[in-house]
């Protein structure tokens, strides 16, 4: 054997030995014998239920998909997966009409819709708490009603049990609240505008009663009281204020021309709040609204001094908080 041939053989042996050493260092799952590029991907793979330490017996009982060769630990999971191969998306979102293969995919999608809303009711029986943000009602269920993600949560309307507060909230607001809205008759034009009673008596209390959608509209009774801030505002704007004795009746009736115009036409607004851009067709309503803004801090409540931050939080605070309107400006 020539010297050059001997060198070629030794080089081949060294290369083969190096390849054997490199292959021995390749990360490999000891359960399913699958190889990975690095230890990080191997650790991620080992978290899978079929390849966790101590679960090697599961490998011998895998259920394999005939379409894509994926394997599952039980038959229900295999059937759930096979729905994606059927090509039929039978689950439809009632909000955006998007379709899905499986119920769990639809539930995750509805949860995203739910978090975009700005009004949430507590789904617990005999609890009337309402929230502006999704995080508020979810924390309320966990902290106040002591629901957890490891125990079933019951629906206050149909008493069904759900695996988490999130699933309960999706069920309650889409299955019950949406069904209630769709079954309710469309309100007439006169029902959309609740009767408004405006009183200029010296009562120290102003009451705002906003009827929920499930109930017929109620009267919105507002007393101006004897607040120094309102009196000062009235004096400064006396030239633009209507004569309440002649032009403002105690109760607006749908038969009155001014009320009928609100229904049949779109009049040009005369008064607008410079802070929250709410427009009014009546100077008295504009006065009452402007008196709620604290001087120098537009989103601070002039009644109780609460700092609200923006116009949405400010509006919800005025509607839901218990206030003594007679103390405005004092």
Curated annotation (Swiss-Prot):
Pfam family, one: zf-C2H2
Record key words, sorted: Metal-binding, Repeat, Zinc, Zinc-finger
Entries under Gene3D superfamilies matching the protein: Classic Zinc Finger (3.30.160.60)
Tissue specificity comment: Expressed in the somatic gonad.
InterPro entries xrefs: Znf_C2H2_sf (IPR036236), Znf_C2H2_type (IPR013087)
Start and end residues, zinc fingers (C2H2-type): 27-48, 63-85, 91-113, 120-144, 153-176, 271-293
Chain positions covered by the region annotation Disordered: 183-203
Function recorded in the entry: Together with ehn-3, may play a role in gonadogenesis.
Name of the protein described by the UniProt record: Zinc finger protein sdz-12
């Amino acid at each position: 054997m020539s010297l050059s041939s001997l060198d070629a053989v030794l080089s081949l042996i060294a290369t083969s030995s190096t390849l054997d050493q490199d292959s021995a260092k390749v990360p490999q799952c000891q359960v399913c014998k699958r190889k990975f590029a690095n230890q990080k991907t191997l650790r991620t793979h080992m978290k899978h239920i079929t390849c966790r330490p101590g679960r090697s017996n599961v490998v011998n009982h895998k259920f394999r998909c005939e379409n894509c060769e994926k394997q599952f630990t039980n038959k229900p999971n295999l059937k759930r997966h096979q729905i994606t191969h059927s090509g039929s998306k039978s689950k439809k979102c009632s909000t955006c009409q998007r379709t899905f293969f499986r119920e769990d995919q639809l539930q995750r999608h509805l949860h995203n819709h739910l978090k975009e809303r700005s009004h949430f009711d507590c789904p617990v029986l005999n609890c009337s708490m309402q929230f502006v943000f999704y995080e508020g009602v979810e924390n309320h269920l966990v902290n106040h009603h002591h629901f957890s993600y490891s125990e079933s949560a019951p629906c206050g309307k149909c008493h069904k049990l759900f695996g988490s507060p999130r699933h309960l909230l999706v069920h309650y607001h889409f299955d019950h609240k949406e069904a209630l809205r769709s079954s309710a008759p469309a309100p007439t034009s006169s029902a959309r505008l609740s009767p408004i009673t405006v009183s200029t008596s010296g009562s120290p209390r102003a009451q705002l009663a906003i009827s929920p959608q499930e109930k017929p509209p109620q009267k919105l009774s507002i007393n101006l009281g004897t607040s120094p801030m309102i009196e000062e505002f009235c004096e400064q704007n006396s030239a633009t204020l209507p004569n309440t004795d002649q032009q403002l009746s105690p109760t607006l009736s749908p038969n009155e021309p001014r009320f009928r115009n609100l229904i049949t036409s779109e009049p040009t607004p005369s008064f607008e709040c410079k802070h929250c851009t709410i427009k009014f067709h009546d100077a008295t309503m504009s006065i009452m609204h402007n008196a709620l803004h604290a001087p120098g801090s537009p989103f601070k409540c002039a009644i109780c001094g609460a700092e609200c931050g923006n116009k949405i939080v400010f509006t919800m605070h005025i509607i839901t908080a218990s206030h003594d309107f007679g103390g405005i400006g004092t």
